[in-house]
Amino acid sequence: MKLLEQIEKWAAETPDQTAFVWRDAKITYKQLKEDSDALAHWISSEYPDDRSPIMVYGHMQPEMIINFLGCVKAGHAYIPVDLSIPADRVQRIAENSGAKLLLSATAVTVTDLPVRIVSEDNLKDIFFTHKGNTPNPEHAVKGDENFYIIYTSGSTGNPKGVQITYNCLVSFTKWAVEDFNLQTGQVFLNQAPFSFDLSVMDIYPSLVTGGTLWAIDKDMIARPKDLFASLEQSDIQVWTSTPSFAEMCLMEASFSESMLPNMKTFLFCGEVLPNEVARKLIERFPKATIMNTYGPTEATVAVTGIHVTEEVLDQYKSLPVGYCKSDCRLLIMKEDGTIAPDGEKGEIVIVGPSVSVGYLGSPELTEKAFTMIDGERAYKTGDAGYVENGLLFYNGRLDFQIKLHGYRMELEEIEHHLRACSYVEGAVIVPIKKGEKYDYLLAVVVPGEHSFEKEFKLTSAIKKELNERLPNYMIPRKFMYQSSIPMTPNGKVDRKKLLSEVTA
C-alpha cells in the first residue's frame, strides 16, 4: 500500500466527497489535497534542509488533518498536541522533540514555547498563497522515516515520544482495512483526540478507503444531549472508541440501531472490553460486528483482533483480545527471560514491523523497552497475558497488580466481576493506601435500576453476588456511588481524578 497516493486517489475520483466533519466545519478530499499540498510546499520552501518534527496544535478542527498530511508530504513527522494538554507538558514536548515549528488550528494558550508558531490565520494565508503548488513527492516521509510521534506518559514524569514510522503505519492500516472488512466510503466515528493513538485507528483506515471522519469533541461528550444529537445526524458505520466511551453511550436508552441504522463495525482498543458492554451492543446493534483489539502505542495502535460473538461471550468469562496480525508475532516472556509455553502467563512481547523504532531522544528508555529478536524489532509491553491456540488473553498491567494483606490480585479482574453484578452500570476499583502499603479496596459504582431505599442495602446485594464469584480478600471493603465515572480526554477511566476525589 502506498499510503499518501491511496488518500490522494480519492481527490481525483471523488473530489467532492466529505473527508472530515466537525460540527459545522467540513472538508472534501479535493480541499484536503489542495490545502495539504500548499502547506507542504510552504514548509519545504521555509525549511529546505530540515527534517525536524512539527508540532500540530488544536482539537478536532479539519485543519488538524490537513496539517498532518502537509507535514509528511514535506518530509516531516508530525506531533499531535491536543489543546487539553497542560502547558508544562506542551513545553516539555517542544524541548524533547527538537521541533522548530508549531502549526495551530486554534489559538495557542501556551506561552514562551521555543518554536515558531503559525496561527490559524497564517495557515489560511498559506493555503491561499501557495494554492496550486505541489510538493516534490520525493520529499515525502517514507520507509523507516518517522510519520508521527505521539507522546505518552512516562514513569519519570516526563512524556515519552513514541516514534511511528511510515512502514509501521502502512502495516497497521493495511491490516485494519482487510481484517476488519472496511468498505469504501463509510462514515467513521472520530472520538479520540489526535494526541491519543486510538485516533489513528479511524483516521487512516477512513482516508485510504475514501471514507468520512465524523468528529465529536470533548464539549459534546460533556453534554450528552449534544453528543446524541450529533450521533443521530452522523449515519456512522464504523465506530472506533474506548470501551468506556461506548459504555457511557449505552446508558442512553436510545443509543441503538434506531439511532445508527447503518452501523456495521465497532472497533475497540485502549482498554479491556467488558463482557457486559459487548452483550449490550449485540442486543442494541444485532447486525453490527464487534471487534476487540489490543496493542500499545509503541506497536502502532493494535496488533491483535477478534470478532466478539454470542458464542465467544458464552465461552469466555473475560474476553480474549484476539489473534495477532500476520506480519507480527507475540511472545510471552517469563521472569527469567525464557519463552512461556501455551497457557502460561508472562509479559507480552510484540515482534515485527508494527513495532516503533523507540522513544525520541531517550536512548536509555528505548534500550529498556525495545530489543531485537531474530533480526526484528521487539517491544516489551509491561502487560501480563498468555496465549492459547494463537489467541491472546490480556491480564492487565504487570504494574497494575497489587498486593493487599499478602494476596496478589488484578484490579481489572475485580472490576470485571463487579460490572457483571445486578444493579451495576459501571464500576472502577480504587486501591487505598495507608502509608506505603495498600489498606483496602474501594469500589466506585454507577448503579443501575434498583428498588433499595438505602445505599447499605444496595451494597449488601452487590457484595452477596461478588461473594459467589471472588474470594473474600478480593471483595471491596467500601462502596461509593456516583452518577458517572470520570474519563480522561482520551476516553479512558480517569483513575488519578477518581483517587483524588475519594481521598480528598
From Swiss-Prot:
Binding sites annotated in the UniProt record for D-alanine: D197, V301, K492
Keywords: ATP-binding, Cytoplasm, Ligase, Nucleotide-binding
Residues annotated for ATP binding in this entry: T152, S153, N292, T293, Y294, G295, P296, T297, D383, Y394, N395, G396, R397, K492
GO-annotated cellular components: cytoplasm
Pathway stated in the Swiss-Prot or TrEMBL entry: Cell wall biogenesis; lipoteichoic acid biosynthesis
Subcellular location: Cytoplasm
The protein, known as: D-alanine--D-alanyl carrier protein ligase
Pfam families (UniProt xref): AMP-binding (PF00501), AMP-binding_C (PF13193)
UniProt entry tagged with the keyword Nucleotide-binding: yes
HAMAP family the UniProt entry points to: DltA (MF_00593)
Catalytic reactions on record: holo-[D-alanyl-carrier protein] + D-alanine + ATP = D-alanyl-[D-alanyl-carrier protein] + AMP + diphosphate
Domain of life the protein comes from: Bacteria
Gene3D superfamilies listed in its UniProt record: 3.30.300.30, N-terminal domain of ligase-like
GO molecular function, one term: ATP binding
Main location: cytoplasm
Role, per record: Catalyzes the first step in the D-alanylation of lipoteichoic acid (LTA), the activation of D-alanine and its transfer onto the D-alanyl carrier protein (Dcp) DltC. In an ATP-dependent two-step reaction, forms a high energy D-alanyl-AMP intermediate, followed by transfer of the D-alanyl residue as a thiol ester to the phosphopantheinyl prosthetic group of the Dcp. D-alanylation of LTA plays an important role in modulating the properties of the cell wall in Gram-positive bacteria, influencing the net charge of the cell wall.
Statement: the UniProt record of this protein carries the keyword Cytoplasm: yes
Biological process per Gene Ontology, one example term: lipoteichoic acid biosynthetic process
PROSITE patterns xref list: AMP_BINDING (PS00455)
NCBIfam families reported in the protein's UniProt record: AA-adenyl-dom, D-ala-DACP-lig, PRK04813.1
Family according to the record: Belongs to the ATP-dependent AMP-binding enzyme family. DltA subfamily.
EC number: 6.2.1.54
